[in-house]
Structures are given as C-alpha cells and as structure tokens.
C-alpha cells in the first residue's frame, strides 16, 4: 500500500479525489492502492528544556545557556494530534511506500520529516512537490515523484532554523525574564514611593 501524508485534511481530500481513493476511514482515506492521511500542520516539536535535563526545569541564570547535546522531537501534547499520529504511525508501519505530500517549502518538509521520524518510517519515501491543488497539478506531480533524499538540504535548513529559534528563544526568554523582569518587580515599589 502507498501511504500519502498531507499537511492538512483539505489537501488530503483533494489528493485522494485525484488518486481515486474514496473510502473514508478514521484519520485517512483509502482506495485504488493508496491510503491518504494528514497532519494538522505541526504534530511534532522540539523537546522542552526539561526533557533534556531535569535541572533545566527550574529557571536559573546558572543553567544558561541551555544547549542540548543532541536535539530531539516529541509529539505536541494535544488529544486530537495524538490520535491522528497513532493513525499515521500505524499506516506507515505497514506501508510499501510513503509519499510526502507536505507543502512545497522548508516548513512543509520539516513538518512531515518529523512525523515520519517519530513514526519510525522504514520504507522508501518519495516527495510530491506541487504548488497548486488543481487536478492537473496533482496528476503531474504524481507522475514526477522525486526521491525524498533530493530534499535533504531543504529539511536540514528547516531543522537548523528550528534549532536556532529554540536556542535563542529558550535562552533569551529565561535570561531576559530572570535578569530584567526581576529588576522591574524590585524597583516598582521604590518608584511609587
């Protein structure tokens, strides 16, 4: 079975229609040798600081900068996302081929790669690269599927951006909060006097 994973349910429906997959199941559409499923944008995210080191759970200047030895991903805690991920994981475990139908771009590549990694996808993966959801564009895209590896640099760029955002966001937020907001709270009563 070929498993197609789109970034949104509406895109999955468009793709399924063109492929002739019409049988609606829980979390996917099946037919004509395809199972078309979807994410809801991001299902996975980089782990939180405390997922790497327990001492990072407490906000302290002494723990900065926080730089994990290796970044990891986790499911976003949301019952709807978790349920859909279980569907995706099950489909991928039994797939002969996966077709990444994520949005054509850096973020679309990152979103789908993280889901496939988390699901432990082992079969060959191909990439549908289209910028339009017309029937003609979808048909042409499926005629010209590309090896997933052709998009490794795009994925790595998205991953680098996500890691950079994490490093700056997590560290700067804590530094600013601990260093400067504490000064505001201390000096506030003094200014009112």
Regions found by a protein language model. Give the residues of each.
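Single conserved hydrophobic/aromatic residue that forms the stacking wall/gate
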Residues: 184-193
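Intrinsically disordered, low-complexity regulatory segments
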Residues: 1-179
């Amino acid at each position: 079975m070929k498993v197609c994973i789109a970034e949104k349910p509406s895109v999955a429906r468009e793709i399924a229609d063109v492929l002739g997959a019409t049988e609606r199941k829980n979390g996917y559409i099946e037919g004509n040798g395809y199972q078309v499923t979807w994410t809801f944008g991001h299902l996975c995210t980089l782990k939180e600081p405390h997922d790497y080191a327990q001492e990072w759970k407490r906000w302290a200047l002494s723990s900065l900068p926080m730089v994990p030895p290796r970044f990891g991903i986790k499911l976003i805690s949301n019952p709807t996302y978790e349920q859909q991920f279980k569907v995706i994981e099950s489909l991928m475990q039994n797939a002969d081929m996966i077709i990444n139908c994520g949005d054509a771009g850096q973020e679309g590549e990152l979103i789908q790669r993280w889901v496939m990694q988390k699901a432990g996808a082992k079969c060959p993966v191909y990439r549908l690269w289209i910028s339009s959801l017309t029937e003609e564009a979808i048909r042409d895209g499926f005629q010209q599927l590309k090896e997933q590896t052709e998009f490794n640099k795009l994925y790595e760029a998205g991953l680098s951006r996500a890691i950079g955002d994490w490093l700056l966001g997590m560290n700067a937020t804590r530094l600013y909060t601990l260093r400067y907001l504490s000064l505001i709270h201390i000096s506030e009563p003094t200014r009112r006097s």
